Amino acid sequence: MADILLLDNIDSFTWNLADQLRTNGHNVVIYRNHIPAQTLIDRLATMKNPVLMLSPGPGVPSEAGCMPELLTRLRGKLPIIGICLGHQAIVEAYGGYVGQAGEILHGKASSIEHDGQAMFAGLANPLPVARYHSLVGSNVPAGLTINAHFNGMVMAVRHDADRVCGFQFHPESILTTQGARLLEQTLAWAQQKLEPTNTLQPILEKLYQAQTLTQQESHQLFSAVVRGELKPEQLAAALVSMKIRGEHPNEIAGAATALLENAAPFPRPEYLFADIVGTGGDGSNSINISTASAFVAAACGLKVAKHGNRSVSSKSGSSDLLAAFGINLDMNADKSRQALDELGVCFLFAPKYHTGLRHAMPVRQQLKTRTLFNVLGPLINPAHPPLALIGVYSPELVLPIAETLRVLGYQRAAVVHSGGMDEVSLHAPTIVAELHDGEIKSYQLTAEDFGLTPYHQDQLAGGTPEENRDILTRLLQGKGDAAHEAAVAANVAMLMRLHGQEDLKANAQTVLDVLRNGTAYDRVTALAARG
């Protein structure tokens, strides 16, 4: 018998579900999703065999009251079962995407195929189920097992270690012919005690033998890192082993999905938006080109959710510059999303969303060398943008990072390096690996491709955050140096291409026109005014 806290996402199916569970002898208490998350966490703490169940409901997961916060705080600590909207929330919480299913289903019977494992053991296959949904989960991260599907759509997921699972369909419906049995087997699975095993040691041994990890193994390793479960000497050995051999795209993707799953949630928009970001570490100490480009892109009508951190190797990282502009780095997720909606730009401060990285910081500081963590920053944007322009500090990283973006499910992205800089530049050819609908194309770009004049790298030199603020203030007000204008124009033009505007020369001219009318600076002051 389970003690179930059923979170009601304001849906009549909640009561059908409660009746089914109570018929089978389970204790069920129901709370609506407008109750503070802490109140529900305190209530769960009083239960003997607690299970959190997330009901169906209208709308999208990010708007379902306290549900996203509950998932962030409780996954891995107690069993969680999600149904329909609850299932979608689980997919999002672990780093997946929820979007339109292509049709609106209301009481439709479908026969899904499943893996016959765990909660589906012994059930009919295909299994008739009831579907009531217009959204569906996709880009499911490696940490979740897809254990049921219908015509390529995800119908169920589970996380064995965390004892978290979700069903896109309704097991409590009469149209789900074996729904009662499925619920019982799910609760039995959820309450099983995992035998403690040292599952990380075989993974570490593979690294010591210079073998490449699978995406799942890398995911497992870095999940342990962000939970603080790895000893410093183990983490140091793992990072150095991968560095010497060279990190594989599947290893980078596994680490990225682990960090995304453990990140604080951000209400992901359904409209098209992008990130423009560099790894840093190129040693150029240039002005903050990608940060300036984000504001200019917004003034050009694009939407940019920029993920960034303080400086590691330069005098001024993106967050250092933003702080100098008076922009609040601790802006909460809802306010940041509102800024993205209304201004076309927001900034997500990495330490606010990825608190688990604190466990790796002492080791990184002691090693004093680049490791896999140096390339993870651009890949772990908690907003999960479908588009990205990513600069890398080494030409050897261009193709591997593009391959990683493909594994992570990006819709379209470009990875670039140019003459020692982690962005598109005009002083040297820009090496590009462009991902578009699963295909990667490699090519080079020069200043001529943008219709711009080449400039020397020295003309992009920056300084302290305050010095860079003053430089970019002039630039965004339409009073900047020609070299600075051209650098931003090239990068925003490339970002516009990722949005389907293929003509780089026309794009660059549009950017220059916007730069010179000063409207980009209005985005800076408006964002700073939001506090």
UniProtKB/Swiss-Prot annotation:
Keywords: Allosteric enzyme, Amino-acid biosynthesis, Aromatic amino acid biosynthesis, Glutamine amidotransferase, Glycosyltransferase, Lyase, Multifunctional enzyme, Transferase, Tryptophan biosynthesis. Residues 202-531 are annotated as: Anthranilate phosphoribosyltransferase. The keyword Glycosyltransferase applies. Pfam families: GATase, Glycos_trans_3N, Glycos_transf_3. The active site is at 84 (nucleophile), 170 (for gatase activity), 172 (for gatase activity). One of its GO terms (molecular function) is anthranilate phosphoribosyltransferase activity. Pathway: Amino-acid biosynthesis; L-tryptophan biosynthesis; L-tryptophan from chorismate: step 1/5; Amino-acid biosynthesis; L-tryptophan biosynthesis; L-tryptophan from chorismate: step 2/5. L-glutamine binds at residues 57-59, 88, 134-135. The keyword Amino-acid biosynthesis applies. Residues 3-196 form the Glutamine amidotransferase type-1 domain. One of its GO terms (biological process) is phenazine biosynthetic process. It catalyses: chorismate + L-glutamine = anthranilate + pyruvate + L-glutamate + H(+); N-(5-phospho-beta-D-ribosyl)anthranilate + diphosphate = 5-phospho-alpha-D-ribose 1-diphosphate + anthranilate. Its EC number is 4.1.3.27, 2.4.2.18. Cooperatively feedback inhibited by tryptophan. Part of a heterotetrameric complex that catalyzes the two-step biosynthesis of anthranilate, an intermediate in the biosynthesis of L-tryptophan. In the first step, the glutamine-binding beta subunit (TrpG) of anthranilate synthase (AS) provides the glutamine amidotransferase activity which generates ammonia as a substrate that, along with chorismate, is used in the second step, catalyzed by the large alpha subunit of AS (TrpE) to produce anthranilate. In the absence of TrpG, TrpE can synthesize anthranilate directly from chorismate and high concentrations of ammonia. PANTHER family: ANTHRANILATE PHOSPHORIBOSYLTRANSFERASE (PTHR43285:SF2). Monomer. Heterotetramer consisting of two non-identical subunits: a beta subunit (TrpG) and a large alpha subunit (TrpE). In the C-terminal section; belongs to the anthranilate phosphoribosyltransferase family. NCBIfam families: PRK09522.1, trpD, trpG_papA. This is Bifunctional protein TrpGD. The lineage of its organism: Bacteria, Pseudomonadati, Pseudomonadota, Gammaproteobacteria, Enterobacterales.
